[in-house]
A protein has these predicted regions:
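Alpha/beta-hydrolase fold active-site loops
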Residues: 31-32, 62
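Bacterial N-terminal signal peptides
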Residues: 2-12
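A generic local structural motif
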Residues: 18-22, 51-53, 150-151
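A short beta-strand-turn-helix
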Residues: 15-31
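Structural alpha/beta surface segment adjacent to cysteine/selenocysteine redox centers
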Residues: 37-124, 190
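Generic structural signal for beta-strand residues in well-ordered domains
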Residues: 24-26, 34, 58, 157
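C-terminal cap of thioredoxin/glutaredoxin-like
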Residues: 36-38, 48-49, 120-192
């Protein structure tokens, strides 16, 4: 009987964990695109453009796009940005995704020296307390969420960003819209 309670608890935790991510598109879809991203990565910025210009317009009503954090050690402020995105998503659902877009669109303007000020300005511009947003960078619970994503990615064999998984099928760093769309279309057809 103990194993049953453990299994139920694990299922409940797994269900809750899915909602901690920034999600775009259909929250109810069984077709999931996991996006392992580093918010200081130029290739991730390119993928963000593909997501905004091609994937979301075509699939927002039918596919769940989940953002996962995979900050690379070579990027000085990527982990802070991932933590900030987690805080902002909790403070105001959807704002974490907006921040991810902002960080990727401004990755050449943001640096270690101005990171906190840029975060503060973003938070203030969205009606949040800027000091709380900056203080959240030291929140160990949020840092653990980012680290959990990173470790999950490592366990899946991910080493580069962006890595996109279409119901488990990987696309790594640079890939064409047509290839991702073909995989999504196949998963949508299989789910019918």
């Amino acid at each position: 009987m103990t194993w049953l309670f453990a299994a139920l608890a694990l299922a409940a935790i797994s269900g809750m964990a899915a909602e901690q991510y920034g999600v775009e598109g259909s929250t109810q879809s069984t077709v999931r695109v996991l996006i392992y991203e580093d918010l200081q990565c130029p290739d991730c910025a390119d993928f963000r453009s593909m997501l905004d210009q091609q994937l979301l317009p075509r699939y927002a009503a039918t596919v769940r796009f989940e953002h996962r954090d995979f900050p690379l050690a070579k990027h000085a402020w990527a982990r802070k940005a991932a933590t900030a995105a987690r805080y902002l998503e909790e403070a105001q659902p959807g704002l974490g995704v907006s921040y991810r877009k902002y960080a990727l669109a401004n990755l050449r303007a943001i640096n270690v020296d101005n990171f906190n000020q840029r975060l503060s300005d973003f938070a203030k511009g969205h009606g949040l307390d800027p000091a709380q947003a900056v203080a959240a960078l030291d929140d160990q619970r949020l840092a653990a969420l980012v680290e959990n994503d990173y470790q999950d990615g490592v366990a899946r064999g991910i080493a580069k960003t962006p890595t996109v998984l279409v119901n488990g099928r990987p696309f790594i760093v640079t890939f064409a819209f047509e290839d991702v769309a073909k995989a999504i279309d196949a998963e949508l057809a299989a789910s019918q």
